[in-house]
Amino acid sequence: MTTDVAPGTMENETSKVMSLKHKAAYVPPPIPHVEMNQLPLSLLLRNLTVFTAKEISQFFKLNVHTGGKTPFEKKLELLNMILFLRNQFLKLYVLVKWAKTLKQNNFHSLIDLLNWFRNANMQVNNCTMALKQILGTMAGAKLPNPDLATSLEVLMLGRPNLPNHGFNLNGSQSDNLTIPNKLILKRLRDLNTCLSIKISLMTIPSQLAKYEIKDGRIVFTVKDEFELQLSTIDQNSPLFFVNINLLFNERLPLNLARLEKHINEILFKSTNPLCLVYQFLHKYILTLQMYMIHVELNALGLNGKYSGGHLVHNYDSKKQIITIKYWLQSKIANTCKCVVGMDKETESIVLEWQNPDVNKETVTTRYHGLLNNIESIIDEITFNHAQMIRADLLRTDTFQEDNEDTTSTSLLFQIPTTCATVSQIQLKIDQVSGIFYFHNPSNLLLSYARQINQSSNTQDLITVLGRLKLDKVDSILRHMLDKTGWICSDVVRLKSSIVPSTDSTFSKDIFVKLKDWPSNWFLVLTIISSTNTCIVEKRIGKILSVKGVWKLKYMDKKNVITSKLDTMTYPKMLTLQISILNKIVNHMIIDSLNELKIKNKICTFTTEDSNILPPYIIRKDGKENTDNITVIALGLESFLEGSKALNTILESSMLLKIDYQKMDIELYGKFKTDNEMIRCQCDELSIKFLEEDSLSFFMSENFGNLNDIMLYLSKFRKKLTQLIALTDVMDTLHSNFQSMDFRVVELRPNEIRFKYLPMKDSPDNEDCVIRIVTNQEKVEKLDIKLSEHNPQAMIQRFLDEKEGFAHNFIFHYLQFTLPLFRASKEADYTSSSPSTVKMHLFMHSLQEFHFLYRNHKVGGELSFIIQLRSVVRTRHQENTQYFVRFAQDYSQPQLQQQHPLSKAIAEIQKNAFSLALLKEQNSNTTSSTTTAGTATAGATMISTASSNKLLDLQDSSPTNAAVDWSSIKCVRLGSALACSHDQILPLLLQFHKSISDC
């Protein structure tokens, strides 16, 4: 089977295959595929999700107990964290979107391409670095100076045309290999001559003036710096570097190749080469010396004398400055600084001690020659600094010279060991660290050594030593007080000392007491210490704890006892326990009196006060010991809080006497005038009157505990309040009830039982009982109770309904209205036969009474209304009278004639209410009648407000004589009849007689 092929087909296919093979031969190699450091997308999402959850959980755990951040700051941190995590997810999201946009997800090709570019870049960088290294190693292959002639020879001939000087330069061996000595010597002489001529033509700096020419070279010597060797080839060639030696340190390694290069460049290029060479070498030497000083300071601060952080320095290589700081632990040395640098004037290295307090005229502050000498220089500086501090302390007069100290680094100061002896304490300064320390210190000195080293200046150090002395005195006194039985309180702490400290004095308080002392009372010992003296002030004070803070409530600032420390002895401490007790109690009483706002004053037993004190207080014969007696004057008004009866009853001051030996407390008082209370006896009040002065009295109590003194003072106040109340009531009773029937039945501190009615009127043992209701401080009220059979018992109801009546008003009222209640019985006593008329008394109020006369014989009744009214007599005088009128109007004749007692009515109207009769009876009192008539409109009912204006009324004797109308004096006021207290009873009896005659 054959196949037909179109012409030219085989040729075309062959050409295509050949062309494809030709193209395949030029296809670049494939990019290396990278499979390392590639993660699946799922794993990446998982890791990012786990990381996000952990970050959020960790954030909330860390911010739960964070108290220093505000809620706003916490919210801001949470927001920042959420934004960061969101950005991570956004990056991953963008990466996924970008991968999807590639055709067939072939993003691996981009990763491989990026990796190939990185490798290619790395290879290029490596080649660049290799070339740089080759260039660095070819530095020695360069000619020192560009020589065009030699370069041209090398270019044309292939080698330089140099003189051979008899040497075989073709590389063949020769037997004559040594240079002839004559040639060497001749060449050296020629070089010496050439150098002499050349150096004479050059400008030589003064520092290089010392030089020597020998062996074909010129040697310049600079003291303590270097030795430079230069040479030349011929007259026309410049000088070049041969060698250099350091004179200050021969072992120091040098980079001669680099030095040779710089020096040769200077010698070749400069017109004044020697000056520039010296400047270059001088700066180079100074730099080396600064570095060597830096190394020496490092060794000194790390392993040397000043190791342990006592010396630090800072080396600034750019500025060529070394800053040295010493005594780092000392605060009293303000400036502990040295600076090492270049001196512009001398162009040398100097060390300057920068201390503004140093006297530069007497103390060196600038040092030269530091190399290998820096330690001794720093030692000298620290010694001088210690001497400055020592001199400052000696000028304060607190310290003394220590003559036994050969190093002059110690000081002496005195602190007490006992109250009478002192000891010398040695204070030294450590020159290495600059701190103070004590020689053979105790625990107290060790504790204060730390405070001394914290002082920033001399005054602070003196203050610390003052506190040291103060604490030592405090411990001495506390030990002495403990041994003598005193109790030192370590709990009481006031905010500030009683005597404030000053710049030169220091104070501290010790609060002590005895076992049996009153609570909160202390003897305050104030230690006032200065440089040369120490005194102790003794005060008495009361200190209380208010809400956890100790506060001074009372302090005796007048009687301050001041003693020097050397006078404080054990016997005096024991004696103080006895003498101070009285003062403690005195001030306790005064403090309590001040809190109660009671005026007081302590009476001393001097000549002036002894003349004021009564003789019954303190005997003036000198037989009574006044050391254990205290007398305090009290203001009566403040003691009793302003009682109304004070001004008329007692003297304005009282005396409180306390005998600590007998443990007695007595209160003395005195009445202003004689009164009824003096003649009465009330055993329950425990008040005793003095024989020397009948108006004086006293109350006494025996106390067993000092804390109970104020309780007895309260008892005295209560008894005195009762005494004043009783005195006031007794005087008022005797002034109102002046009849023979008045007498006090029983007298108690809070109760008075008395009788003021005749026995025929009241069979009771007492007619009235007055109970004085008091509290702990004053009289609250008087409770007045009338007896059951008292004719005036009906008044009790009105007294109980309205309280607040003054007792003076009640007593006046009882006495003034007594005739009304006695009228019935007086009528029975005056009549010779049994009376057919009965009198009945009714009370409408305290100002109005109703009298009812009932005649059983005729069967008639007649009523009268009696009122109590105030009548103005003059401008400054007001009187209370009875106003009597008929209960009914009998002015019409018909009513009068129809009444069973018309005869009595007519007689009473004629004799009592007739104007003609009244005019005849009162012809001598016309002016008074007119005045009273004009005041009728102003007559008012008696009230409590006018009770104090009642006139003193006297009780008349029982009316036994027969009365008639002519003996009755009355005043007609309109339809009423006004009569006085003396006329009311005869008037009522005359009414009774007129009604009985009907």
From Swiss-Prot:
One Pfam family named in its UniProt record: Med14
Keyword RNA-binding among UniProt keywords: no
Record-given protein name: Mediator of RNA polymerase II transcription subunit 14
Keywords in alphabetical order: Activator, Nucleus, Transcription, Transcription regulation
Chief location: nucleus
Quaternary structure annotation from Swiss-Prot or TrEMBL: Component of the Mediator complex.
Similarity comment text for this entry: Belongs to the Mediator complex subunit 14 family.
Highest taxon, organism lineage: Eukaryota
Reported function: Component of the Mediator complex, a coactivator involved in the regulated transcription of nearly all RNA polymerase II-dependent genes. Mediator functions as a bridge to convey information from gene-specific regulatory proteins to the basal RNA polymerase II transcription machinery. Mediator is recruited to promoters by direct interactions with regulatory proteins and serves as a scaffold for the assembly of a functional preinitiation complex with RNA polymerase II and the general transcription factors.
GO molecular function: transcription coregulator activity
PANTHER family: MEDIATOR COMPLEX SUBUNIT, MEDIATOR OF RNA POLYMERASE II TRANSCRIPTION SUBUNIT 14
Cellular component GO terms, alphabetical: core mediator complex; mediator complex
Compartment(s): Nucleus
InterPro entries, per database record: Med14_N, Mediator_Med14
Record GO biological process: regulation of transcription by RNA polymerase II
